[in-house]
Amino acid sequence: MDKLLIRGGRPLVGEVPISGAKNAALPELCAALLTADPVTLHNVPRLQDVATMLRLIRNMGVQVDRIANPDCSVADAAGIVRLDAGALSTPEAPYDLVKTMRASVLALGPLLARFGEATVSLPGGCAIGSRPVDQHIKGLQAMGAQIVVEHGYMIARLPQGCTRLRGARITTDMVTVTGTENLLMAATLAEGETVLENAAQEPEVADLAEMLIKMGARIEGHGTSRIRIQGVERLHGCEHAVVADRIEAGTFLCAVAATGGDALLRHGRADHLDAVIDKLRDAGVQVAPEEGGIRVRSPGAAQLKAQGFRTTEYPGFPTDMQAQFMALNVVAQGTATVAETIFENRFMHVNELLRLGAKIQTTDGRVAVIEGLGGAAPAGARLSGATVMATDLRASASLVIAGLVADGETLVDRIYHLDRGYDCMEAKLRGLGADIERIQ
């Protein structure tokens, strides 16, 4: 099993490319199921979840051609994927392909909308709380779908005599990104108008909507909490570039800040990271949009002030940045309180940070109080390298950030979590001067 060996203490300096967003690429791959015409996606990241999704749709009978440099030393090689679902023969997502990736549920809406039936295994792939799919099911039922859950599968079909879903006004009980995406895709081929209330406003949802519009969909209000979709009879193919990954960009912002570096994040979108950037600036980090990306300069963590925050839905502070910013707080000055409101069980990185010397106390798995090490000694206290174990995707990133500033060697085990969401992370960090390598 692969591990990352990190020798800390080097500032990150230079330029780093930000890849396409996993959370946009996955639904956009599923959007190709909505049409019989070819679809071409650019800037598709090289990630385990993307590879799993491609295997899933290929298993359905979709022709998939991928042009990507498999060499992770070429960290800026944007991937191109061409998909042709014209001969799709099996509208089914079996458990053996779905079990490692929750996003496979995104195939449900497109398959049902285009073929009138779909069989999708209940998803797996994430250890963070329950993340129920009931909002997907309720929304599709409101559009006329008949759905039963049995033997671990969601079996969906249109009522006898119906050839299309019907438009509906749908208000989800909670803000759900994948739920919004699934219902958005299904609604593009429904009869009449669909209104999604309490819709997710994330940039990845808006980017999916932009792709669907290129395919001929009629959508208004994406990027707001109310999305209107006027269904059409068919969609056509398109070319689309996946939006830059704001969470990868935020992760590198925290890594550069923690190490006292100076870097340009090429392709990064500052306007998608307002909540994170505001906290970094409050901490003492210089962050500014620059032509072609985001510039970040830091005096070093020991001179930064720890920042409290509360995770909320976009445009608030993203839950997917909680662990990385906590790692920065660990080595900054002062005390900060972090409240996690989106998912349960999302402090699993805390025990591993404690192994490196962090000072963190948690309450009920929802609130963490971090006593920064930056003010603990005249020269600033230090983390000390150790062997740590990744427990989920963003926890992995927080341990890497901590390892970059720790004294000595840090060994991060179970980095398959990292490979699910970061495109060639160690190659990009080496390009900024980090001493990091992948070992067996």
UniProtKB/Swiss-Prot annotation:
One CC-aspect GO term: cytoplasm
Annotated compartments: Cytoplasm
Superkingdom classification of source: Bacteria
Gene Ontology terms, MF aspect: UDP-N-acetylglucosamine 1-carboxyvinyltransferase activity
Entry's EC annotation: 2.5.1.7
GO-annotated biological processes: cell division; cell wall organization; peptidoglycan biosynthetic process; regulation of cell shape; UDP-N-acetylgalactosamine biosynthetic process
Binding site for UDP-N-acetyl-alpha-D-glucosamine: R102, R131, P132, V133, D134, Q135, D320, I342
Family, similarity comment: Belongs to the EPSP synthase family. MurA subfamily.
Protein name: UDP-N-acetylglucosamine 1-carboxyvinyltransferase
Gene symbol of the encoding locus: murA
